[in-house]
Each structure stands twice: as structure tokens, then as C-alpha cells.
């Protein structure tokens, strides 16, 4: 959970650092960012496979009692979900307060659905963080999240979903993230 949050946040920090401090307009290239994300998500998926086997190998189908056994295929599936979620949250951070406003119901839902105190506490901390940040990030924004914050939030969202065993529920729970990511993909593909 912490590895996902801080790991994806670190990737965002490197990107922001290269943009702001080193004055490189692009920051990390898309290829560099994807390589770092693949490496991090592979590490997290392997650790989950070793220590929390059921959260990786058995995918819960939302609103059913069905747990689909995907065995070793859980690793690439989780990698795809981690990379997709962190990038979708990052893409949502375009307008003042949008990413934080979208994250509020997501973290509230995690608090409600959590089965253990650690997940509930972490989701509560993240909820408090985005609520506090929203005050400064609402229109007109005086503080911006950048890739550091948006990638860290994406890592926290996907980390909680994996830890709680509800990764496929992210498609519904993070509907705005999914819609934003699909919108960007369609726009890039059509131009």
C-alpha cells in the first residue's frame, strides 16, 4: 500500500523535478515514465503474489460472490490496473480541484468497504489529505498537485483496491478516471 503510494508519487516527483528544477519542458519522456511504472508495478505485483496471494490470483467480480481464479495471470492484470489507474488519476488532474473532488467519494467508499483497520485508517488519511488540499486547489487554485500528487493519489487508490481485493470494482468506483483516460486515448488516436 505504501509502496504503491510513495512509488508512484516518486515517479511523479522525478517528472516534476525535471520540469521545474532542471528546466526541461517535457520532464520524463513517455517511454521513461512507462518503464518506471512497469518496473514498480511488477515489483508490487510480485510482492502481492508472494505475501497476499488471494488479492492477486482471485479477482472479485463486483456485486457477486464470484472470485475468478486467474492464478499467475494476476500479475500482468494487476500491473495493467496499477499503471492504468495511476495514469488515469494523473490525467484527471487537469482542472482546478477536479482530481481531488473525484478522489473524495473514492476514499469514502474505501472507508465504508474496508474490512480491516489498516485500510480504513489509510483511506481516512488520504481523504483528509485531499480534503485539506482541495481548499488550496479549488478555482482559482493557489497550489497545484503536479504529477507528484496525482500519481501518489493514483497509487493510493490502486493500492487500497488491491489490498482490499476489489481491483475490478475500480472500473465502477473510478468511473470519472476511466472516462477521462478513455477520452484522452480517443483524442490522441483521432489526431
Predicted regions and their residues:
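Juxtamembrane helix-entry segments on the extracytoplasmic side of multipass membrane proteins
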Residues: 67-73
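Alpha-helical transmembrane segments
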Residues: 1-13, 44, 49-50, 73-191
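Cytosolic, membrane-interface loops and tails of multi-pass inner-membrane proteins
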Residues: 14-29, 185-191
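Membrane-interface helix termini and inter-helical loops of multi-pass transporters
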Residues: 20-21, 53-66
Amino acid at each position: 500500500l505504501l509502496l504503491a503510494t510513495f512509488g508512484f508519487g516518486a515517479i511523479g516527483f522525478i517528472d516534476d523535478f525535471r520540469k521545474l528544477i532542471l528546466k526541461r519542458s517535457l520532464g520524463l519522456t513517455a517511454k521513461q515514465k512507462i518503464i518506471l511504472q512497469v518496473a514498480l508495478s511488477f515489483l508490487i505485483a510480485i510482492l502481492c503474489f508472494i505475501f497476499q496471494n488471494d488479492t492477486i490470483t482471485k479477482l472479485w467480480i463486483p456485486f457477486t460472490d464470484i472470485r475468478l481464479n486467474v492464478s499467475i495471470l494476476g500479475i500482468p492484470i494487476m500491473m495493467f490496473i496499477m499503471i492504468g489507474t495511476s495514469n488515469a488519476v494523473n490525467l484527471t488532474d487537469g482542472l482546478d480541484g477536479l482530481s481531488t473532488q473525484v478522489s473524495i467519494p473514492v476514499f469514502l467508499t474505501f472507508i465504508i468497504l474496508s474490512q480491516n483497520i489498516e485500510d480504513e485508517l489509510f483511506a481516512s488519511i488520504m481523504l483528509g489529505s485531499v480534503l485539506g488540499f482541495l481548499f488550496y486547489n479549488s478555482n482559482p487554485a493557489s497550489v497545484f498537485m503536479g504529477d507528484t500528487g496525482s500519481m501518489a493519489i493514483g497509487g493510493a487508490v490502486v493500492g487500497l483496491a488491491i489490498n482490499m481485493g476489489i481491483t475490478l470494482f475500480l472500473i465502477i468506483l473510478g468511473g470519472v478516471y476511466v472516462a477521462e483516460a478513455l477520452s484522452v486515448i480517443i483524442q490522441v488516436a483521432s489526431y
